[in-house]
């Protein structure tokens, strides 16, 4: 893994910083684990915009990732590491002893030729997936389930991880990167180690077009709009003279957005405290 700063041969290259990984596979992805991915332009079935700033971008195939890690007690070998345009993390193609291939998130330190395994009897080793009741307290894990059998939902992006800090009864307590501490059923499966490609945060796109390649359209400030388009719009000068709100008038910048009170009992400590 190397950080490469491009030479300023043009305005669009001047500030570009790339993350180069020589271990990544340079050929095509494994076709049986690909699925079609249609562009929506951020529109729903009525043609109305439901998500702003989406449109265009390069065509992509979706890689079918094994987030459940439910092929228990069958060892697998890492065939290759690959780039995935759908996520910040890299992925690994693994070949199981019974001949099946699957994609998994590539954890930090996993290399081609390494052996991995899932199941309660798997050793504590990077890339192995176990129920958290079998993982020692203090271990760093990723791709953590919130419900047994549903598949990993926590810590899936590049460089992400959570730490198991306690085990009590049927629950384990996790410390998330945000500082939040929450309880999860000990039967839930997690993968040992942290997600790889942590240098992803250091990349600099360098020009607007690089975001357009990714299907991301420009974000216009509310103060630059007319009053008909945004509550911050219009007026003389740049001061909109009110509390900041979304285009639909909902308070922003600090307003609480969590509404799922049913699971509040599992959160031991809120993030940022």
From Swiss-Prot:
- Report one GO cellular component: large ribosomal subunit
Which PROSITE patterns does its entry note? RIBOSOMAL_L2 (PS00467)
Q: Keywords on this record?
A: Ribonucleoprotein, Ribosomal protein, RNA-binding, rRNA-binding
Q: Which GO terms describe its biological process?
A: cytoplasmic translation
Region feature (Disordered): 221-262
- The Basic residues compositionally biased stretches are 253-262
What are the GO MF terms of this UniProt record? rRNA binding; structural constituent of ribosome; transferase activity
- Does the record carry Nucleotide-binding as a key word? no
What the entry lists under Pfam families is as follows: Ribosomal_L2, Ribosomal_L2_C
What InterPro entries does UniProt report for this protein, alphabetically? Answer: NA-bd_OB-fold, Rib_uL2_dom2, Ribosomal_uL2, Ribosomal_uL2_bac/org-type, Ribosomal_uL2_C, Ribosomal_uL2_CS, Ribosomal_uL2_dom3, Ribosomal_uL2_RNA-bd_dom
Highest taxon of source: Bacteria
State how it assembles.
Part of the 50S ribosomal subunit. Forms a bridge to the 30S subunit in the 70S ribosome.
Q: What does this protein do?
A: One of the primary rRNA binding proteins. Required for association of the 30S and 50S subunits to form the 70S ribosome, for tRNA binding and peptide bond formation. It has been suggested to have peptidyltransferase activity; this is somewhat controversial. Makes several contacts with the 16S rRNA in the 70S ribosome.
User: Which family, according to the similarity comment?
Assistant: Belongs to the universal ribosomal protein uL2 family.
Q: What is this protein called?
A: Large ribosomal subunit protein uL2
The uppermost taxa in this organism's lineage are: Bacteria, Pseudomonadati, Pseudomonadota, Gammaproteobacteria, Pasteurellales
